[in-house]
Amino acid sequence: MAFNLRNRSFVKELDFTPQELMFLITLAADLKAAKYAGTEQPQLSGKNIALIFEKTSTRTRCAFEVAAHDQGAHVTYLDPSGSQIGHKESIKDTARVLGRMFDAIEYRGASQATVEELAEYAGVPVWNGLTDEWHPTQMLADFLTIMEHTDKPLREVTLAYMGDARNNLGNSLTVTGAMLGIDVRMVAPRELWPDEERVAAPARAIAETTGARVTFTDDIAEGLAGADFIYTDVWVSMGEPSEVWDERIRQLLPYQVNAEALKATGNPDVKFLHCLPAFHDLGTEVAREIHARTGLTALEVTDEVFESPASIVFDQAENRMHTIKALMVATLGR
C-alpha cells in the first residue's frame, strides 16, 4: 500500500500511524538496496534543508548530510554559535523566516516544545533529530535493523531495554514498540520507568489495538527471558549535570548489559542494540574520568558484549542514514 506523506512533519512517533511507520522502514530498505546497487535515483534535487543542532551530534548530522547529498539536496548547518535562534529571535519568528528560505527543517535540541513550534509555524516539513522527550528518527533505524536481523514477524519479536527507561530513547521505544506490535519490555529501576501519563498509559492503549505487549519491570530475569534483542543507552543523557553519574551508576550497574545478561535471555541468537555513543571501554575522556573515580572499565555495556558477534550496533548506526533518507524522500520528494 502506498502512502502520501508529502509535506508532513515528524516530531514524535505518534505523528504517523503504525502503517505509515512501516512504510518509511520499507522505503528505507529499498533506498539502502539501491545505494548498494548503485541505482539510487535522486528525488530531492534543488531542495534546501536547514539542519538546526542545539545539541552536538555525530550520527544524526552525518546521516542527514549524506542522505541529503545522495538525493541531490543542499543543507545549511546551524548551531547556537552561528545563529540567533532562541537567543535574539523567537522560535516562532525563526520558523517563519526559515520556512521562506528552506524546503524542510531538521531540529536537534533539548525542547520538544521548540520542535513542535517550528512545525506549527514554518510551513514546511520539520523533522525531530532528538529532543529530551522523543527520538523518532532513531526508531526508524532501530526497527529497520531489527527486521534485518530476525526471520520473525515483528509481532513475534521481543525487545528488552535495560537501563534508564525514562529518557527519550526509553519513551520512544515504549511507544514505537507498542505501535509496531512487538513484545517491548522496559527493564529498569522503578524510579527510572517512563512517565505514566505521557508515555506508559498511551503505549498500553496503543498495544490494545496492535496486539503489542508492553511491560515495565525491575526484575532483570523476568525482563530478559526469551528476548530476541537487548537494547541499552548511556546512563546520563546529554544536558544532565555530571554530578548525577555516581547516583546513576549506583542505580543502574545491576542493569549493565554483560555476558550474564545475554545468557539470561536463554536465546543463543540474541542481538545487542545501542544508539551510540557507548561507554564500553576506556577510549573516551569521560570513561577514563569515571574509571579513575570508581574503577569501572565499562558502564552500560561491557566491551565483551559490544565487540561480540551479538552486537549489531554499527548496522544500526548505518541505518540512521538510510531511514532518515526515507523520511526526507517521503515527506519532501517529488
Curated annotation (Swiss-Prot):
Pathway in which the depicted protein is active: Amino-acid biosynthesis; L-arginine biosynthesis; L-arginine from L-ornithine and carbamoyl phosphate: step 1/3
InterPro entries: Asp/Orn_carbamoyltranf_P-bd, Asp/Orn_carbamoylTrfase, Asp/Orn_carbamoylTrfase_sf, Asp_carbamoyltransf_Asp/Orn-bd, Orn/put_carbamltrans, OTCase_ArgI
Pfam families: OTCace, OTCace_N
Record: residues binding L-ornithine: 168, 233, 237-238
Subcellular location: Cytoplasm
Gene Ontology MF terms: amino acid binding; ornithine carbamoyltransferase activity
Broad class of enzyme this protein falls into: transferase
Function field: Reversibly catalyzes the transfer of the carbamoyl group from carbamoyl phosphate (CP) to the N(epsilon) atom of ornithine (ORN) to produce L-citrulline.
Protein name: Ornithine carbamoyltransferase
Organism from which the protein derives: Thermobifida fusca (strain YX)
